[in-house]
């Protein structure tokens, strides 16, 4: 996806791109066109901040829903009001929920316009999970490193037990699970983030192995998809990161995933964008 890839610095730019700011501007543009008289402060009023947009954008790969985004925006808006941020027409007695719902709708739509292919890919993975649920099957996939991932969320049951302890009534909660009953909702909601995280882990492993075996780098500091090493090796690590990323994604990862799903009745693969994955090697701000 060349649009989403550009917004996330997968191609070279003179300055780093900021996907949160890109989505903010896109949402603001949509609200200006909408011109709803009850919410003009967010569009033409220019009050939509980057902070209000950040969490909805960050949690989109984790299956964030419209309602979830509304709640995130409500939490952030209250935080900003508590700090003393002034929003024209909003005071301590204002019902924030209509504003949050309106913002969530436009931010959700703006994200879809900025990361077009990512959202299509996420929906396709969720459709695969739904098809797997119909056959009551876990989902398996094999990473390029050979590691086999199994996703199987078990449905658990929590029972409340009332009893007397030291002469007083107490409530205890006991949980149990049935290994044969999958949690269908979690299977669907978890597939996209789990798939992405598995590829992040694969990229990490390939990077560390290549950096050590080919360049003698033995010290690493890693948190999720954040990579670090000593200052003397940081430039070389940046090169290795780009090389292993391209090596990982030049394969058709989704097609390989689809072929591992056996006899499931699957939807067609989503249409791919025009990003040239080799451009990552020249993307200055891919790793910084």
Where are the model-predicted features located?
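Conserved catalytic core of nucleotide polymerization and phosphodiester-bond processing enzymes
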Residues: 1-288
């Amino acid at each position: 996806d060349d649009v989403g890839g550009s917004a996330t610095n997968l191609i070279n730019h003179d300055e780093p791109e900021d996907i949160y700011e890109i989505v903010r501007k896109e949402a603001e543009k949509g609200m200006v066109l909408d011109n709803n008289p009850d919410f003009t402060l967010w569009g033409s009023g220019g009050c939509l901040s980057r902070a209000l947009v950040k969490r909805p954008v960050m949690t989109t790969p984790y299956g964030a829903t419209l309602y979830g985004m509304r709640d995130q925006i409500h939490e952030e808006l209250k935080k900003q009001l508590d700090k003393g941020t002034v929003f024209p027409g909003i005071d301590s007695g204002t019902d924030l929920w209509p504003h949050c719902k309106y913002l969530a709708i436009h931010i959700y739509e703006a994200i879809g316009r900025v990361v077009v292919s990512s959202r299509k890919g996420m929906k396709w993975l969720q459709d695969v999970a739904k098809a797997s649920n119909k056959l009551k099957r876990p989902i398996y996939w094999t990473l390029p490193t050979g590691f086999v991932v199994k996703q199987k969320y078990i449905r658990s049951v929590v029972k409340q037990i009332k009893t007397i302890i030291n002469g007083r009534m107490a409530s205890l909660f006991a949980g149990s699970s049935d290994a044969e009953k999958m949690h269908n909702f979690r299977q669907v909601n978890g597939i996209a983030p789990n798939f992405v995280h598995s590829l992040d882990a694969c990229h990490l492993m390939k990077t560390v192995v290549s950096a050590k075996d080919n360049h003698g780098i033995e010290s690493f500091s890693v948190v999720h998809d954040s990579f670090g090493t000593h200052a003397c090796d940081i430039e070389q690590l940046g090169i290795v990161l780009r090389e292993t990323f391209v090596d990982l994604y030049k394969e058709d990862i989704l097609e390989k995933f689809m072929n591992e799903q056996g006899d499931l009745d699957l939807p067609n693969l989503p249409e791919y964008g025009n990003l040239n994955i080799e451009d990552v090697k020249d993307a200055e701000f891919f790793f910084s």
